[in-house]
Amino acid sequence: MKKIGIIGAGISGLYIANLFKKNPKYQVSIFDKKNSLNIDEGYGVQLSINSVKFLNEIGFNKLEKNEKFNPEKINFYSKKDEDKICELDISEFNSNDCKYTTLKRSTLINFLKKDLEDLIKTNYSVSKIDQEQEKIKLSFENKETHECDYLIISDGVFSKSRNLVSNKKIQPKYNDTLAIRLSLIHI
């Protein structure tokens, strides 16, 4: 059995862990630096039909309909004068089982972690990553170590682990754009 180490218990880390968990040839361990997973209600997520297609492979299509929303269009407005620039009909890209979807980030995280609770280790901040022969050795700030055959780094845009592997500090690049997303509910 091959051991898979996943650094980061966000959306991508939990998604890939679900895929590996389905295969008995792999043993998965997920490490996250925080003391608990962030399931605050305040954030929303937009899922393209391609991402919904992949999430359906792990049961996303069984999520209750009242926990997600399938918008039909996106309106684009000018920041400067608040005029509507255009409207995009996103429903034309939908299929019966894969629709452009919005939902709370907390709903998506709860869905992704529901079968992984026993695999997630919190308060595990990586301090060192070493390649030793055929194994990868992870050292953590809590003085614990873990060995794995394969390592998946998914700890976000400000990834400490990526910097440890590349031996240099990699900074995200920004292009001064902003996206504001909201749903208007008609009463």
Model region roles, listed by residue range:
Residues 16-26, 54-57:
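A short, Lys/Arg-enriched amphipathic alpha-helix followed by its capping loop at the start of a domain
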Residues 1-12:
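Beta1/beta-strand and adjacent pyrophosphate-binding region of the FAD-binding site
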